[in-house]
């Protein structure tokens, strides 16, 4: 099923706006299965499993291209058969709708959306 968030584009965040509060973040989180709040609700993260290093690397490269296209960049760590992605809007030191849009798009890149590809 295509997540509605994945069809949207990021809007430039200029800073100076408030981050989503916890209840707003949880509402968006309900549309991003597999993602969880981290750092006291200031970012979201998800762990993905892959069959080998090359698959994890391909995911990271594809996600990096998407981040460049959207102008919104995650923190990524990866190794053999795994990757962890974290989204946060750095200009507001918290979560913005863009983070959840990118989470949905990240799931599309990962393949089946359940954290394994």
Swiss-Prot record:
EC supergroup of this enzyme: lyase
Keywords carried by this UniProt record: Lyase
A single GO molecular function term of this UniProt record: 4-alpha-hydroxytetrahydrobiopterin dehydratase activity
Cystine pairs: none
Keyword Transferase: no
Swiss-Prot/TrEMBL GO biological process terms: tetrahydrobiopterin biosynthetic process
UniProt record similarity statement: Belongs to the pterin-4-alpha-carbinolamine dehydratase family.
Protein name: Putative pterin-4-alpha-carbinolamine dehydratase
Origin species: Azoarcus sp. (strain BH72)
């Amino acid at each position: 099923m295509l997540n509605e968030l994945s069809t949207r584009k990021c809007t430039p965040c200029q800073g100076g706006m408030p981050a989503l509060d916890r209840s707003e973040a949880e509402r968006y989180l309900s549309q991003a299965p597999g993602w969880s709040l981290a750092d006291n609700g200031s970012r979201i993260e998800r762990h993905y499993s892959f069959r080998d290093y090359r698959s994890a690397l391909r995911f990271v490269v594809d996600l990096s291209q998407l981040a460049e296209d959207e102008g919104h960049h995650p923190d990524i760590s990866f190794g053999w058969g795994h990757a962890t992605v974290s989204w946060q809007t750095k200009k507001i030191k918290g979560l913005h709708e863009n983070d959840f849009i990118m989470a949905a798009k990240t799931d599309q890149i990962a393949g089946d959306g359940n954290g394994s590809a």
